[in-house]
Amino acid sequence: MDQVYLPQSVRTAVAVSFGVGLLYWVYRLLLQKTKSLKALDLPVLQSVGDQDIVKTLEEGHAKYPDTPFALGVPGQQLVVLPVSEIDTVKALPENQLSIKKHHYNQFLGEYSYMGTKADEFDDAMRYLLVRNTPAVLASFTAEIDYAMSTVLQVPPNSWTRVKPRSIMPKVATILSGRAFVGLPLSREPDWIESNVNYTQDVSRAWMVLRFYPHWIRPLVAPFLREVKTLEQNKALIGRKIAKLLADQEAQKLSPAQEKIPGGDMIDWFKSRYQAQGKTATAQQLTRDQLLATFASIYNLSNALTYVMFDLAANPAAVDELREELDQVLGPNVGAESIDKTALPRLIKLDSFVRESQRLSPTSLVNIPRIVTDPNGLRLKTGHVIPPGYLVMVRAQPINQSPTLYPNPERFDAFRFARLRQQGGANENRWQHTSTGADNINFGHGIWACPGRFFASAEIKVVVAYVIRHYDLRLIEGRPHPKPKYGGLAIFPDAGAEVELKPRV
């Protein structure tokens, strides 16, 4: 059949009509959201784009510092709670406030497994992972040289530009994979690529699908490239896990071999199922592995990226961190020697990492929950939030509090080390992994991130390795890279660079 060519004027008219129709559809969606939020009898703030969200939240907090307000952002609507409500929400069970429902909705649980985790997964993460931090740390230190030398190939005797956001997902995948599934699987190129892509595709798919109503997502999602590759990566990882389990069964029949660090997480997952009289299937363990992978790679690689920016911007602090490594590990001893006794003594390093997180958290708000109590969520302010609504606690007023942190806008590398020197409860209160009303960047309460000890240990091993082996600096004439925003999420600039030079 001959092709039909429309005149330019006709094509333009069609394009304009489509654009007008699309704008009207978006307008109708925003209008529907506003009506829904107005039904709450709360003040409503509307952010029309990702880049004005910070300003909108600051405006809301300035006007309503001690009471909730409703917020509409691109693709999302929620109730923003004041800091005073942290104690209200921190300990409520799933049948009153659900973090799982939030994760399922936010991270496309029907495609990603998010929000579908089993009790056995929670037990393994909450108890076995925390209890066995020394074993996890041993896997990191055993793998750090391989991970960094594989991913970060910098020629000697010269400054080389690198993009931390490009390299850190692979570093996090290799290190976490050593702890999760062990060698040799954790080093297989297709395993690394699939885990990195899975994590990135979850967030990319959400960035697109958030603009569609929930009822239409099942119609749109199968046609998205991100969802297609998400399914492909899930399938490959599932096949790898099934083979790993088969190999483990076969090894039981072989003579015992000396245990090398790594591969503990899969065993911990299996043990929690066995404790309940169950045998974990390959599909269940694949789901558990992917859930752990997303948490470790996405948040961890972002945190490592921010830390790299902060190291490059603060050379004097880097010198002090190296001195601390000398004092704790010994002169010129590398990150490979960090163990369970050395890690808690790296107080300045802990402070540096927490300060980086304070100024570059994962989200502008935290402690996300969907109200599931049929009677709603009753706040201290007297407001009742009906079931089905998303609530979150504002985090920026804490992170930027001049009362808690003098000159809060300034990066002060050893701010928390000085606070810990005050002694008493301050020793624990100001650690990187501590949560409370003064730090909700890991959440708080019964659903505080159980992997924060895992993440903190991994970040410190990477930082120790980097500053032992490289000098860092910002590119001359360029400012400290600024974060990007997608909805309420904060993520580092993927195009931002720093310069590295191997140390002699």
Swiss-Prot record:
Gene Ontology terms describing biological process: gliotoxin biosynthetic process; mycotoxin biosynthetic process; symbiont-mediated suppression of host immune response
Domain of life, per lineage: Eukaryota
Record key words, sorted: Glycoprotein, Heme, Iron, Membrane, Metal-binding, Monooxygenase, Oxidoreductase, Transmembrane, Transmembrane helix, Virulence
CDD domains: CYP503A1-like
EC number, as in UniProt: 1.-.-.-
Bilayer topology annotation: Single-pass membrane protein
GO MF, one example: oxidoreductase activity, acting on paired donors, with incorporation or reduction of molecular oxygen
Positions of transmembrane segments: 13-31
Name used for this protein in its record: Cytochrome P450 monooxygenase gliF
Gene3D superfamilies in the cross-refs: Cytochrome P450 (1.10.630.10)
Cofactor: heme
Gene Ontology CC terms, in alphabetical order: membrane
Family listed: Belongs to the cytochrome P450 family.
Chain residues that bind heme: 449
Organism in which the protein naturally occurs: Aspergillus fumigatus (strain ATCC MYA-4609 / CBS 101355 / FGSC A1100 / Af293)
Keyword Iron: yes
PANTHER family named in the record: CYTOCHROME P450, CYTOCHROME P450 MONOOXYGENASE AN1598-RELATED
Location of this chain's protein in the cell: Membrane
Pathway it works in: Mycotoxin biosynthesis
Main location (coarse class): membrane
Coiled coil: none
Glycosylation sites recorded in the entry for this protein: 197, 299
SS bonds (residue pairs): none
Function according to Swiss-Prot or TrEMBL: Cytochrome P450 monooxygenase; part of the gene cluster that mediates the biosynthesis of gliotoxin, a member of the epipolythiodioxopiperazine (ETP) class of toxins characterized by a disulfide bridged cyclic dipeptide. The first step in gliotoxin biosynthesis is the condensation of serine and phenylalanine to form the cyclo-L-phenylalanyl-L-serine diketopiperazine (DKP) by the NRPS gliP.
